[in-house]
Amino acid sequence: MSEENSSSPPKKVRIYSRRGDLGETSLFSGPRVGKDHPRIEAVGAVDELSCAIGLARSFGLPEETDGILERIQRKLIEIGTEITAMTPGRHAVPTIQPGDVRALEELIDAAGESLPPLTSFVIPGGTPPAAALQLARAVCRRAERALVVLLRSDAAFSRRPIAWFNRLGDLLFVLARRL
């Protein structure tokens, strides 16, 4: 390596490619699809959910709640990768296993034990972290709907994430009530 090369400034990394300027994007599995494709809609909703959870976490939640939500964000990244990497017509090993749904149910039950019974609809608000978790719950329901559309358009997509997102919405609701 010459001295000339070692003293040159590091190459800047461009975040833009211009390849999506006409409304298409690439999947990890290779093909290009429209940005309104069910897979892109679903992965976008999953990404928005992770961002909404991140917003809630930024308010400084109790350590246990923060840990739960961080693990969920990591799972959401795996799910997003699964959505964009799956090959049409080929079943992949799903990210969500039956035990994952049961684990959310156990968290819901434990978090809800100390809460008073509901006597009316909950109006989102209260504390900033509770409001942020309610927003995350609403985004979760949108992601769930996007996954239903994806399942209808591509039977190779596993049904398990739909149940997981259904429980996740319930968990976010219960966690918001605790704040």
Regions found by a protein language model. Give the residues of each.
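Phosphate/pyrophosphate-binding loop motifs in nucleotide- or prenyl diphosphate-using proteins
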Residues: 1-179
